[in-house]
Amino acid sequence: MTPINLMDALAKRLQDLLTDYTAKQPSGTVPVTVYPGYIPVQNNAAEKKSFVYVLVVETDDRAGNDKSIAVVELGFSIYDADGTDGWRSLYNVVEHVRQDLLKFRFVNMKFRLDLEKPIVFKVPENQPFPQWQATLTATYTIGQPEEEGFNYDDFQEVQAYGQYEEYKNH
């Protein structure tokens, strides 16, 4: 249950969720594409795609927890050439995704949305028209492997404490 598994599973789920969303391009209607990880390098600048990327930007492992957390950034870039109301397309897609994350908090029954941390929605002030961009950041629990190699429960019980003098100064 690695961050890559989370990115792949969440990207697939969002791709299924956004099948009805399209962007009107000069060449016709283009679907919104969801990428796990970074978006591919764009070689054709003639038309800009509408896309979402799913990227784990941070993980946190702490002692005493049986779960680790992964901070996931969902990046949105939605094409809409309407200079007056084009921004609404962005907000519509982001809100659709946000509501889905809240309604269905498990991803593949392996990762769970952690609402002890907020879901954060950010829209940059400067937008590269006709692309409208935003990010949504959410925190998910991911599995944490158990430590191997030393049984701390038996450390002082199995042998007399005096045998561990060498550890006192470390």
Predicted regions and their residues:
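"Short basic amphipathic alpha-helical interaction patches in structured regions
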Residues: 66-72, 86-95
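Active-site-adjacent structural patch at catalytic or cofactor/ligand-binding sites
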Residues: 54-82
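Residues at beta-strand starts and edge strands
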Residues: 48-50, 68-72, 128-136
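Short, cysteine-centered beta-strand-loop-beta hairpins and adjacent loop/turn segments enriched
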Residues: 61-64, 79-85, 141-150
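Generic marker of residues within folded, mature protein domains
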Residues: 44, 64-66, 124-128
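Small/polar-rich, solvent-exposed N-terminal microdomains that initiate assembly or binding
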Residues: 1-63, 154-170
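Acidic-leaning, charged glycine-interspersed low-complexity segments
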Residues: 91-149, 170
